[in-house]
């Protein structure tokens, strides 16, 4: 029996809420589609801004209490809001008890896991993974890794996407052009591989106007310090930086010791072309499956090719601009937006709810009927969109 194939769902979502967050993009997409979303924001329980050593130490000491607060809040919302879907983006503070509270009321729990490793983000997240009704992973190797590590088979690959509200060509004034304009940019968190490639690029093209945006670049050696902007950029500023750079370099994260593979596709793979930027992407079979080389983006496979491609496209404005336009068209026409990804999540939730409804008693199934007056989200006042 179909489970309300057209009716909006009640969704309890765990996500960060800063503008430009991949997690918050899902929340806004669900709301645009007419679903009722109650939000449990990660930052309500553990402030990510606590970056100094004393504050990090305090957070470690408080962590058991933070987890208890997060679990209590989820259990409370499960009882009061009665969600059809518990949507968790990563969920480092989501416990098995929180998931079971939703499932006990007949709801479905779905996780969207964006990282290469399932075991490097705390014990709570790893313990919770087997409890979900379904896991979407942005890595093609993710389902096999979940089965090998946890015996989980209810998982599938779902790539990142672009947020149509954020990742789009964005108007800039002169100060924006001064701040973000450059020959080439890299936007992303530091890693040894990324540093090595950018050092090689600057050795080959020492006069290149390069700008590096992102976190942890203070760990880089002295040869890149002149190019590091010493801060991450988010939301509209991120889109501006993409649009202002002549060449946007997309380097894949190599993964860490506990990951079975490094990235083959990332969120930036979609953000850059959707924002109207020219993308020079590290070559992989997965990026090639989404964007055609030399039509929708350019690609490189080693430091020498990276330098050669940067040099070539800086000298060929027409080719660079044509590829940027084709890349945006490809992103818009190929189902790469967060709205498309969110529809996949909703379709899976409906299928799981329908399967569950066939096995539950009518008295339990009836708790899912949406009253006509149920329009607003249930939750703390801070959950409202601004």
Annotate the PLM regions.
Residues 78-79, 129, 242, 310:
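Short hydrophobic patches on amphipathic alpha-helices
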